[in-house]
Amino acid sequence: AIELMKKFLDAATVDFKANGNAEFYLKYMSVPKEEEIFQTLLLMKEAKFHIEITDLIIPKIGDNLEDARKLVRWIVENLGENTPIHFLRFFPHYLLRNLPPTPIETLEEHAKIAKEEGLKFVYIGNVPGHELENTYCPSCGKVVVRRYGIETLEINIDEQGRCKYCKAKLPFVMEISK
């Protein structure tokens, strides 16, 4: 399947829930072997896809910090430190209406772990206006892409893909239109 996808896709976002916890996947999603997701990610990397990870953090049943650390370590070791990860806020819906929205502090704890483990591009999603919606230069720490929700407000990357402030080369594949 990856070979077929290569003809049409350059990038993929792989969506985890509950930090990829095996028990969660079986109980809530009827996925018997979550390791197949990890194997697919390795095949995507081998096929040179740009990969981003999203992780829906669900309070009380899918927000374990040790599971987060385990997932992030796997990403760093297997996909690399430049792999973006987006920790997404959960909102009650459908069969999980009994749960509260994910506390922002919980998302921030997940982001802190991802940074501690070495990921350079860590985001928080579904929280418009949060500072971790933005992309920061790993060299100088300044905002290179400022966002609000899905809107891009400012890009501080030059035509050569470098930070406009410190000129560090950024690992992005993009075209900047004027």
Protein language model regions, located:
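Auxiliary Fe-S-binding modules of radical SAM enzymes
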Residues: 60-178
